[in-house]
């Protein structure tokens, strides 16, 4: 188990409360059952999570949010770790990225329309930023937005979009004559095409969202028209930190029960854990896991404080964690032997989650290329 030495009592309470809630409401048996649920999660369950603060930690107090420690991103990263440890469902990342953006940049009118229900868990938001075959960069957006009188017309395709088929609101990034802009679009908008995608994760749903001349009023613009590049960078940094925290939480749990398995399982009359070759391998794995946790905490602090190198540190974290965590879980599968590749064992649930996280919002190679 990874030990956090710098948590405040309030943060420890948030972590422990989240852990107990997840263990009680979505044990792995329930996660398997939710694989048959079209949404991948229960709306009533998500509202109960919102009551614990999951949706409001990145939102300013004047708009109904607030954190337990005045370090909202660190608090939310703790929640993400616990959700990774239980392979939990729910739109944690997407809804929080959108809620944070609306809190910071939306007009009072727009925020009052969407934020209250997002914070209460009654509605869900999707972050429509990724485009098929393209990197997430300000100059890499192919989707277009052009004026038509007092309105804007959106044309293009976004995908894969997390909770795209379940969202009530879409935060859409598009390029127009003014530059990069963002729009808040209701899922009920005409000419919106939602195509569910088959995913590896059993409970995390993605979709491709087609905007075939979707008309939105000028009041749907979030922030400054043509000035969304800094907002996009801030959103990506937040998303990468939460992804890394979730991957670390999942890998930590898998490592723990793999070590226990090595003590319980015998081979040639000896516990697996007694073999020196496996001891050395476990030591290497523990080093990589602690390193993944350390770079995630460092990235969280950098993004939380708005450090000048926050974007660089967040990308370094995703590159390292996104590479190491899937490898670590694959090693754990090997150490379990044949039982590790069965449907009945829980290992594949965790491997599915970290592989999806690795590929979403830029894989390690893409982030290394960006850093270079």
PLM feature segments, named:
Residues 121-132:
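A short, Trp-centered hydrophobic/proline-enriched beta-strand micro-motif
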Residues 103-106, 146, 172-175, 184-187, ...:
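Short beta-strand-to-turn element immediately C-terminal to the catalytic PLP-Schiff-base lysine
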Residues 70-71, 137-139, 163-167:
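Short glycine/proline-enriched turns and hinge-like loops at secondary-structure junctions
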Residues 1-86, 105-110, 117, 121, ...:
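Alpha-helical interface subdomain recognition
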Residues 136, 140-142, 160-161, 186-223:
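Flexible, small-/acidic-enriched active-site or ligand-binding loops
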Residues 137-155:
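Cytochrome P450 C-terminal beta-domain/meander region
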Residues 88-109:
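N-terminal glycine-rich flavin-associated loop
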Residues 155-193:
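A short core secondary-structure module
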